[in-house]
Amino acid sequence: MENTEKLKNSKEVIAYVAECFPKCFTLEGEAKPLKIGIFQDLAERLNEDEKVSKTQLRAALRQYTSSWRYLHGVKAGAERVDLDGNVCGTLEEEHVEHAKATLAESKAKVQARRKEQAQKARDEGKAKAKAKKAQQPRRQAPKAPKVEKPVETRALNADEFITGKEVNVNMGTGNMAATIVEINKEDVRVQLANGLQMVVKAEHLRA
């Protein structure tokens, strides 16, 4: 037996009904006024259809007939249609006036809701701007840069030229910390703090 998946919401039900009865229901443009008692006809025609229940049909029909598209179509001179698109009488003035009032009320509610949401968004924006301003730290006068005194160095004594001795290498632009790793007469191999090894003259090393 084939497993029929039920429709999930009124939107899907309306789309399905419009597919089954295209001369009666539409998804775009102005909707046609429906025959009075069309729910019963719809329930009977779809009685064996497992995709949709009577409860879903009733809810979907209520949503369809309260939409602006449908209410716009309920106007003087318009004719009601059945499921097959057959004309079932002209609309009564009472129904036309009721549709106009319902449409005006619905539009007024939407407009009021939009106005309320816009005001709420403005209020939230002001509150955020105020909070952001309060969180901003006061600007402090920039502190004068701390001038570090140059490290005073001296020439190495003869007995200080030993492997593992921490020294300063005079690079011309300043001193760099290093460690003696090898001594070969006047040439001394040192390792800088960054791991780089280099050979320098003994006269360039300072304590």
Swiss-Prot record:
InterPro entries: ProQ, ProQ/FinO, ProQ/FinO_sf, ProQ_C. One of its GO terms (cellular component) is cytosol. NCBIfam families: PRK04950.1. One of its GO terms (biological process) is post-transcriptional regulation of gene expression. Belongs to the ProQ family. Keywords: Chaperone, Cytoplasm, RNA-binding. One of its GO terms (molecular function) is RNA strand-exchange activity. The gene is proQ. Residues 113-127 have a biased composition (Basic and acidic residues). RNA chaperone with significant RNA binding, RNA strand exchange and RNA duplexing activities. SUPFAM superfamilies: FinO-like (SSF48657). This is RNA chaperone ProQ. It comes from Vibrio atlanticus (strain LGP32). Residues 103-152 are annotated as: Disordered. Gene3D superfamilies: ProQ/FinO domain. It is found in: Cytoplasm.
